[in-house]
UniProtKB/Swiss-Prot annotation:
Gene that specifies this protein: creB
Stretches with biased composition (Basic and acidic residues): 36-45, 580-649, 725-743
Catalytic residue list: C64 (nucleophile), H419 (proton acceptor)
InterPro entries reported for this sequence: Papain-like_cys_pep_sf, Peptidase_C19, Peptidase_C19_UCH, USP_CS, USP_dom
Originating organism: Neosartorya fischeri (strain ATCC 1020 / DSM 3700 / CBS 544.65 / FGSC A1164 / JCM 1740 / NRRL 181 / WB 181)
USP domain sequence ranges: 55-468
Name of the protein: Probable ubiquitin carboxyl-terminal hydrolase creB
Subunit structure: Interacts with creA, creC and qutD.
Annotated GO MF terms: cysteine-type deubiquitinase activity
GO biological process: carbon catabolite repression of transcription; protein deubiquitination; ubiquitin-dependent protein catabolic process
Segments for region (Disordered): 1-45, 113-146, 242-269, 496-761
Length: 761
């Protein structure tokens, strides 16, 4: 058993590789293509103007402010052409010689060698007995910007700029360093790469002390300094030339023609191209409120700095920039006409518009509480196209239209730290993101992510607008629509099989018709309505199979013969809907349903309000009726209780008294009428009439009330049921007849009184 184990160990050990064996070398594999390289696959030959070059810039420690501004200036076509052509272009021989020294192509096996070196070091550390094992390192995120920048430095060509000012007859300055960068990119034979602006940074730190430290700098301050430095260097170089040479006209060479056409210079003085591109003219209008005199003062600007407000736009910020300002109290205006300090109104207007408008959004504001600058994360919307309105009446070209071509974005929580990137619109390759060494294509809507309201710390800081025309804008929009439609058609026309090979949808159409069976021939066909208008619903092939109408009378019709397909299909009759169109229709449908629900909810709310109002009105009417009924009932009860109380107190004697009083009253009236009608014959009065006039007794009235309950619904003055209604004129006539019957002799009253006593007894 032991020998078997020894032999097994011996055989197993022999299969292990020896320590000194050299592993086989891996074949070098090219790195995967970047999104930018895929975007540039269909590019034609390299252009001479450098518009098809897309280079990143190496960061030398907090130099992202410089890289982002230089990228924006390079892709400003008139500025780039003016820099390259002033004073003249560098000769091709000297430029090629400089590029041969400065342009270095990386080793394609550098990445594999670096990985092999790392594996070798790891294996050597593992074999050492005293060395602790290396902790497990997290794999690098290949989608992170840091990894992409590292790979770009290892795989892309590196372009180191050098001082080449002597070749075009100028002394070294910040302008010549900028010119060397632009010419190196234009003259290189590679479309992509990385620039090392070390020589430019050395000149910048040599001439300006504030940039000598490795601290975070402001991109807007650097832009203003660079433009002013370029103007100063160009004018200083122009002043060194002899006056005679300056006065002579320059020969019209091809370069000068290209320069005049690209820069659009209106004056022969070539040193004014910076002013013509970036410089504008502001007019400060101040009106004294005492004498109403208006004084004007002109100021030049290379960029406009506007204050920000929450939930605003660039247009509203410019409107606030030109709003009227009251000068009062400590800020009073010294009026020359009045000869003293007076209250006045002041506002700023643009008198001359620049060709390239640089808008600085004041994201950093000094706060008294913190005693330092603080970043404002206000939402400020900036448009793709802009037209300025705050111009004077005599402004030059006041209706100039601008288009956005570059955005400098600040990423960070404050002005003393953070990162700058640039998003630039190229001539024919769309929008690109320039993040130091990394250059990536982005969508047009990506520019809208930096209004200031998105999660994160990225906000637009400097906006670059360049002049354009309405025809160019319409042409660009038409081209964008054509590209989107073409992309949607290509995406829908290509259907992938399960194995991944593309297949045209026409291949699924059967080319032969099936022979109908005998049962199908005997089955009756249903009547079908011939459509006179195109159907709005989707085709059954692309729609929901459950939504396809099915008729029990219609047979399972075989596939009809397909007509021959022409060689070239001009147009698609009914193109299938793409995802974007379906999403838009779904969004519109949901919006319509939402509006319908809102209208239905509003209708139900109004109907409920009307029902509540009707119910409230009915309740008020019912309550008023009940109150009226209660009042009438209370009045009836009060009247009945009063009558009952008097009858209980007086009994029959009270009626006798009332009757005696009425009879005596009548007797007095008879005496008065006796003298008037003494000649009338006496009328005998029967005994029963006297009893009927006296009315029923109290016992009879009480019995009648018990038998017939009171009617509360009738008003107090309404006639009681069972009692005859007597009109007023009839009552008067009846009383007169009574007086006539009882008006002869006193014996009638005595006989009535006697009979009343007999009834009581």
């Amino acid at each position: 058993m032991g020998s078997f184990l020894r032999s097994f160990r011996h055989n197993g050990g022999s299969t292990a590789p020896s320590v000194g064996a050299v592993p086989a070398k891996k074949e070098p594999q090219p790195p995967p293509m970047t999104p930018l390289e895929k975007r540039l696959l269909d590019m034609g030959p390299i252009r001479e103007d450098g518009s098809d070059k897309f280079y990143g810039m190496e960061n030398y420690g907090n130099t992202c402010y410089c890289n982002s501004i230089l990228q924006c200036l390079y892709y400003s076509v008139p500025f780039r052409e003016a820099v390259i052509n002033y004073p003249t272009r560098t000769p091709i021989e000297s430029l090629e010689a400089a590029l041969a020294k400065s342009l270095r192509y990386p080793n394609p096996n550098a990445q594999l060698e670096a990985e092999a070196q790392a594996e070798k070091q790891k294996a050597a550390n593992a074999q050492r007995p005293g060395m602790p094992p290396n902790p497990q390192q997290k794999p690098e995120d290949k989608d992170s910007p840091e990894y992409k920048k590292k790979m770009a430095l290892q795989t892309l060509p590196l372009l180191e700029t050098q001082n080449n000012a002597a070749s075009y007859g100028m002394s070294e300055s910040l302008f010549t360093s900028l010119k060397d960068i632009f010419e190196s990119v234009v003259g290189s034979q590679s479309r992509i790469g990385i620039i090392r602006p070390q020589q430019f940074l050395e000149v910048l730190r040599r001439d300006h002390e504030m940039f000598r430290t490795a601290m975070h700098q402001d991109a807007h301050e650097f832009l203003n300094l660079l433009l002013n430095e370029v103007v100063a260097n160009v004018e200083a170089e122009a002043s060194k030339q002899p006056l005679m040479e300056k006065s002579l006209p320059a020969p019209e060479t091809a370069d000068s023609v290209d320069q005049s056409s690209s820069t659009g210079s209106k004056t022969p003085n070539t040193t004014r191209w910076v002013h013509e591109l970036f410089e504008g003219l502001l007019t400060s209008e101040t009106q004294c409120l005492t004498c109403e005199k208006v004084s004007q003062r002109d100021e030049v600007f290379l960029d406009l700095s506007v204050d920000l407000e929450q939930h605003s736009s660039v247009t509203s910020c410019l409107r606030k920039f030109s709003a009227e300002e009251m000068l009062c109290e400590r800020n009073k205006f010294h009026c020359d006409n009045c000869g003293g300090l007076q209250e006045a109104e002041k506002r700023m207007k643009i008198k001359r518009l620049p060709r390239i408008l640089a808008l600085h959004l004041k994201r950093f504001k000094y706060t008294e509480d913190l005693q330092r600058l603080q970043k404002l994360f206000h939402r400020v919307v900036y448009p793709y196209h802009l037209r300025l309105f705050n111009t004077t009446d005599d402004a030059e070209d006041p209706d100039r239209l601008y288009e956005l071509y570059a955005v400098v974005v600040h990423i960070g929580g404050g002005p003393y730290h953070g990162h700058y990137v640039a998003i630039i619109k190229t001539e024919d390759r769309g929008w690109l993101l320039f993040d130091d060494e990394m250059v990536e294509p982005v969508d047009k809507n990506y520019v809208k992510n930096f209004f200031g309201d998105k999660p994160g710390l990225a906000c637009a800081y400097v906006l670059f607008y360049q002049e354009t025309t309405l025809e160019a804008v319409l042409k660009e929009q038409e081209q964008e629509n054509m590209d989107s439609n073409l992309a949607a058609t290509d995406a829908n026309d290509t259907i992938l099989k399960q194995n991944g090979f593309p297949q045209s949808p026409l291949a699924h159409v059967h080319s032969a018709s099936q022979i109908p069976s005998h049962e199908d021939n005997l089955r009756p066909n249903g009547l079908r309505r011939a459509p006179t208008a195109p159907q709005l619903s989707t085709h059954h092939e692309h729609g929901d199979p459950e939504s396809t109408p099915f008729s029990p009378l219609s047979p399972l019709s075989p596939v009809p013969p397909v007509p021959p397909i022409p060689e070239r299909v001009a147009t698609v009759a009914t193109p299938p809907k793409n995802d974007a169109l379906a999403k838009r229709e779904e969004k519109e449908r949901k919006a319509a349903e939402k509006e319908k629900e809102k209208a239905e909810k509003l209708r139900r709310k109004e109907q409920g309000a009307r029902m509540k109002e009707n119910q409230r009105r009915e309740e008020a009417e019912l309550k008023a009726a009940l109150e009226m009924s209660k009042a009438s009932k209370a009045e009836e009860d009060r009247r009945l209780s009063t009558e009952n109380g008097k009858e209980k107190q007086g009994g029959g004697l009270s009626r006798l008294k009332r009757g005696s009083k009425s009879l005596s009253h009548r007797l007095g009236k008879d005496k008065e009428t006796r003298s008037v009608s003494s000649d009338l014959p006496p009328v005998p009065i029967p005994e029963h009439s006297t009893l009927s006039q006296s009315g029923p007794t109290s016992e009879q009235q009480q019995q009648q009330r018990q038998q017939s309950p009171p009617n509360h619904d009738q008003p107090p003055n309404s006639p009681q049921p069972g009692k005859p209604t007597i009109r007023e004129d009839e009552q008067v006539n009846h009383k007169d007849s009574k007086h006539e019957r009882t008006g002869h002799g006193k014996w009638r009253s005595f006989s009535l009184r006697k009979k009343s006593f007999s009834i009581l007894s």
